[in-house]
Structures are given as structure tokens and as C-alpha cells.
UniProtKB/Swiss-Prot annotation:
The gene is glmM. It comes from the Bacteria. GO terms for molecular function: magnesium ion binding; phosphoglucosamine mutase activity; phosphomannomutase activity. It comes from Chelativorans sp. (strain BNC1). This is Phosphoglucosamine mutase. Binds 1 Mg(2+) ion per subunit.
Length: 451
């Protein structure tokens, strides 16, 4: 079934434009509220957001929708996505909502939905909600005496901080580590520095002054160079960059070298394997993860399971096959011993604890393998199906033939933006670049011809 509203990570788009309008948000609240009313108890939803200006509009619209469906709404305010996933279970809610467009600029926003178990919704449930959105959902709303109430919940930041701290041993202190934390002017701007400080680290917080417009603006996990500069400036031991909703993380070592999600997964997998904590004999990553990670794991007798892009699909594979580490190169890392979704802060704490235990610089601990040369380019499209053009198919076939068994090629439409992503990797960097450029040019030509 083709989806009109939901993409790879919920509903996302430019704020106040379809589908991220107040009207659609209200109807999502109605439809989702009606979909999660099993049992005779008083039904409730926990609702968090990041720091975007449009969050107020979407939040209020969704409150109206959920209350109209007869659900009580617990308002969390600005808080990380993984905190919503944790609190939907802790507060015994029927559904959790995070209003965020993750790493996107402020003018975008999105809606992520979690079930009562703290996991993102399956395609099947999203399809059911989609079907309700286009029907006369008002006919099934609550009677006037059964409408929901909305209330703001106090203390949720402290609850999440304690949850994050409990992922480390009780005797583990980060004392002696100088840590720069870049919160991307996003949802973790309060909780992340506080958690690190409470664990004993010397904390240098940056990008912790959200104004509604500056989330992810030249900062955070998609722009780690500002963090690298600050790490060098204050002579920190390590830097941590989160994104707008803090479900992804990128690390910077003391030399300013960027450590992506693949390296982080390799580090944690090796550590857990050595300590007999790794379950399932491998980890889960997406088709975009570097071939170097696969080779690193294979050298240790571990398997890399690949899924399509989207941390939701990573988690589904982890649950289906009984693995406890998964993630994406972008920095979504899911550690199912602790969390049901990607959690940037919890992941960073595992890295810091490993550095502390080994008593070695981050540069010696965090870079576990030499990445295979990889090139990723995006082609913006405005409609049509350029991947079906004969010239594009020919360029792809040629690239696959030339890369052979020593490389990989991934071409896919973005699930969150009007882009086609072209990625290739292999041991010959010049060949990789040439193959990506040929496919990008073919897609661009097909796009122009169809315009």
C-alpha cells in the first residue's frame, strides 16, 4: 500500500504545508487516538516535542485531536525522542507522540508515533491510521461527557536523566573527562548536559540556547565541525553531537576526528562481545553502513544483518532475530538492553564508559576500522520516476558491473525529503566517485527530460 502521509520515520514536511498542517495534525490525533483504545481503562497519550517554532501549533492541534477521541494528554514539553519512548511505558500510556523533524531545519516538522510498548508503529498500524485520515473520522469521536483532558507533567526531565544514568554501572564515574556536548539547540538542551554533570564529567555545553529557529543550524550531529573546533579550543577529551530530537549521536575525538554511527556500533559490539553481553552473534545496520564495518565484524566472527534505511526497520529486525545492537551510519544507535529506539545520550554514555574503563584517549578507542571509500550524493527531484528511465538503468547496471564483488551500490529515494540518494563504496576511490557521478548525471538528465 502506497502511503500518502507516513514516510520512513513518521509524518514529516514543511510546517504549515501539507501534510504538516494543524488540520492534518488534529486528524492524526483523532485517528491515532481511536486506534489505541483497547480495554476499559482511561486512555492516555504522552506528547513531547523538540524546540521548533511550529511545535506549538502541531502540539495544540494534536491535543485537540486526542481529546476529541476521548484520550487524556500528558504534555512533556521539549524532550528527546527516546524519552518519549521510555515515558510511554513508564506512565502506562496507550500511545506516545514526538513532534520533531529530527535533523532537518526549523521550517520542517514531523510526527513520530510510539505504541504502548515504546516501539515505533509498524507499517500495518500506520496503514490503518492512514485509512482513517481520509475517512469521516469525526463520526467515531467521543461523546461530550467522555472527552479527554490535557495536563502538563512535571519532573519528566529528571526521570529521563535517571534512566540514562542507570544504563551505566552504579560505580561508574566520568570524573576526569572533559566533555563538550553539542545539543543542536534541540530537545536535549537541558537533559544531556545535566546527565553528564551528574555522572561526574566536566561539561562544556554548546548550542543549548534554542529560539525556535536555530535547531540544527550549523550545529549538531549533521554539522560536527563546530564541535570539533570547540573540542580543540578547550582541549577536551571528547565531543558529543546530538541532533534536534537527540535520537542520534556523532562523536568527535580529542584530535577533532569524527566518529560516525558505524564506528560507534563497532566499538560497542566489540566491547559487549568480549564481555559476553552481545546477543545473537552480530548486529543490525542498514544498507548504507560501510563495508568496513561488515569486514570488521566478520573478522571477529560476528555477522552484520542489513535492512532498508530507517531505524524502525533496524529495530524490527533486531526484535525478530533476537539481537541487541543495531543502528545507522548517521548515528541512530539502538541498544535494546536499555531502549526501544535510537538514543543519542545513552549511546554516548556507553562510549564514555568504555573510554573510562580503558583509560585511553578517545582517538585510540573509538576508531575501530578503516572505512572503505564511500561516496554519497543526493539528487533533488520534483516528481516523476527518473529511476525508471532507460538511461538511468543502464548507468546503474554499468556501475554494478564495474564495482563487482569488491564494492556496493545503493540507490534509493529518501523517505523524508524529495531526494534520490546515490551511494557507492569500494576499494578503488576513483572508480567509486566516477560511478556515483555517472548515475547522478543520468538521474539529473532524466529529471530534466521529464520536466
Amino acid at each position: 500500500m502506497s502511503k500518502q502521509y507516513f514516510g520512513t520515520d513518521g509524518i514529516r514536511g514543511r510546517a504549515n504545508r501539507f501534510p504538516m498542517t494543524a488540520e492534518v495534525a488534529m486528524r492524526v490525533g483523532m485517528a491515532a487516538g481511536l486506534s489505541f483504545q483497547n480495554g476499559s481503562h482511561r486512555h492516555r497519550v504522552v506528547l513531547g516535542k523538540d524546540t521548533r517554532l511550529s511545535g506549538y501549533m502541531i502540539e495544540n492541534a494534536m491535543v485537540a485531536g486526542f481529546c476529541a477521541a476521548g484520550m487524556d494528554v500528558f504534555l512533556l514539553g521539549p524532550i528527546p525522542t527516546p524519552a518519549v519512548a521510555m515515558l510511554v511505558r513508564s506512565l502506562r500510556a496507550d500511545i506516545g507522540v514526538m513532534i520533531s523533524a529530527s535533523h532537518n531545519p526549523y521550517h520542517d516538522n514531523g510526527i513520530k508515533l510510539f505504541g504502548p510498548d515504546g516501539y515505533k508503529l509498524s507499517d500495518e498500524i500506520e496503514n490503518r491510521i492512514e485509512a482513517m485520515l481520509d475517512r469521516d473520522v469525526e463520526l467515531a469521536l467521543a461523546d461530550s461527557e467522555s472527552l479527554g483532558r490535557a495536563k502538563r507533567v512535571d519532573g519528566v526531565h529528571d526521570r529521563y536523566i535517571e534512566f540514562a544514568k542507570r544504563t551505566l554501572p552504579r560505580d561508574m564515574s566520568l570524573s576526569g573527562l572533559r566533555v563538550v556536548i553539542d545539543c543542536a539547540n534541540g530537545a536535549a538542551y537541558k537533559v544531556a548536559p545535566a546527565a553528564l554533570w551528574e555522572l561526574g564529567a566536566e561539561v562544556v555545553p554548546i548550542y543549548v540556547d534554542p529560539n525556535g529557529f536555530n535547531v540544527n543550524e550549523e550545529c549538531g550531529s549533521t554539522h560536527p565541525m563546530s564541535l570539533a573546533k570547540k573540542v580543540h579550543e578547550v582541549r577536551a577529551d571528547i565531543g558529543i553531537a546530538l541532533d534536534g530530537d537527540a535520537d542520534r549521536v556523532v562523536i568527535v575525538d580529542e584530535n577533532g576526528t569524527i566518529i560516525d554511527g558505524d564506528q560507534i556500533m563497532a566499538l560497542i559490539a566489540e566491547s559487549w562481545h568480549e564481555n559476553e553481553k552481545l546477543i545473537g552473534g552480530g548486529i543490525v545496520a542498514t544498507v548504507m553502513s560501510n563495508l568496513g564495518l561488515e569486514r570488521f565484524l566478520r573478522g571477529r566472527g560476528l555477522e552484520l544483518h542489513r535492512t532498508k534505511v530507517g531505524d524502525r526497520y533496524v529495530v524490527e529486525h533486531m526484535r525478530e532475530h533476537g539481537l541487541n545492537i543495531g543502528g545507522e551510519q548517521s548515528g541512530h544507535v539502538v541498544l535494546s538492553d536499555f531502549s526501544t529506539s535510537g538514543d543519542g545520550l545513552v549511546t554516548a554514555l556507553q562510549v564514555l564508559a568504555h573510554i573510562k574503563r580503558l583509560n585511553k584517549p578517545a582517538s585510540e578507542v573509538c576508531r575501530k576500522f578503516e572505512p572503505v571509500p564511500q561516496v554519497l550524493k543526493n539528487v533533488r527531484i520534483s516528481g516523476g520516476k527518473p529511476l525508471e528511465a532507460a538511461s538511468v538503468k543502464a548507468a546503474i547496471a554499468d556501475a554494478q558491473a564495474q564495482l563487482g564483488d569488491t564494492g556496493r551500490l545503493v540507490i534509493r529515494p529518501s523517505g523524508t525529503e524529495p531526494l534520490i540518494r546515490v551511494m557507492a563504496e569500494g576499494d578503488d576511490p576513483e572508480l567509486v566517485r566516477k560511478m556515483v557521478d555517472s548515475i547522478v548525471d543520468a538521474i539529473a538528465d532524466a529529471r530534466t527530460a521529464a520536466a
